């Protein structure tokens, strides 16, 4: 394993996989994409390949239409494409997979992931990196949503008590307990992020970049 304090980890590129069969792209997928962009950094977009899969689940017309929508959407892949990223299709067979790997092997330039550059060269704290800020923002948004739901349920319980409606009160109380559990989980994620050492985070981020994206 590299010693990241002394040696920067260089990569040939990054792969982001997306199902072309997805009719719409949900909030979770958009957040994952944004996090991917923060980890890579705009300077590395030229070394990104967006691989679309599940082409056997759509007609050629449907797939090509969605492909164009993905390329042209500002909240999806347009920022990557504008930065020099490429898009490739994978139909589940061996040939397109080999072509994608060949594209990477033919590249002469290497890149350093933004997250690695921030932690190693700039000596930033995890929370001050672009990816760290993005994750904190996501966690805050989720926490605010849960807290809003909690307030609504507490209002519902209070109103049910005033009206003597035991069924509504009990159902709302069950939902309230679930929301409190969700809030506790988000707060735990916050604490875990704050307590993660920079060295450990560098190792994890490098592993993720090499094995997941």
Model-derived segments and spans:
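Inter-motif core of Ras-like GTPase G domains
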Residues: 1-24, 33-43, 49
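C-terminal non-catalytic interaction/localization modules
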Residues: 6-9, 43-46, 56-213
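Active-site glycine-centered loops adjacent to acidic/histidine catalytic or metal-binding residues
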Residues: 53
């Amino acid at each position: 394993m590299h010693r990241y304090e002394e040696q920067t980890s260089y990569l040939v590129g990054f792969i982001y996989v997306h199902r072309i069969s997805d009719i719409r792209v949900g909030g979770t997928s958009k957040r994952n994409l944004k996090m991917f962009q923060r980890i890579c950094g705009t300077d590395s977009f030229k070394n990104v390949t967006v691989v679309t899969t599940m082409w056997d689940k759509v007609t050629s017309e449907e797939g090509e239409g969605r492909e164009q929508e993905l390329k042209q959407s500002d909240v999806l892949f347009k920022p990557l494409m504008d930065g020099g990223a490429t898009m490739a299709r994978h139909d589940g067979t061996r040939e397109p997979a080999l072509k994608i790997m060949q594209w990477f092997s033919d590249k002469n330039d290497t890149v350093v992931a933004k997250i690695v550059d921030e932690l190693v060269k700039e000596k930033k704290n995890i929370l001050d990196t672009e990816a760290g800020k993005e994750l904190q923002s996501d966690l805050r948004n989720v926490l605010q949503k849960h807290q809003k739901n909690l307030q609504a349920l507490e209002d519902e319980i209070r109103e049910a008590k005033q009206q003597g409606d035991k069924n509504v009160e009990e159902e709302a109380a069950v939902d309230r307990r679930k929301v409190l559990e969700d809030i506790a989980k988000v707060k735990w994620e916050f604490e875990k992020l704050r307590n993660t050492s920079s060295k450990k985070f560098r190792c994890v981020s490098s592993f993720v970049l090499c094995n997941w994206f």
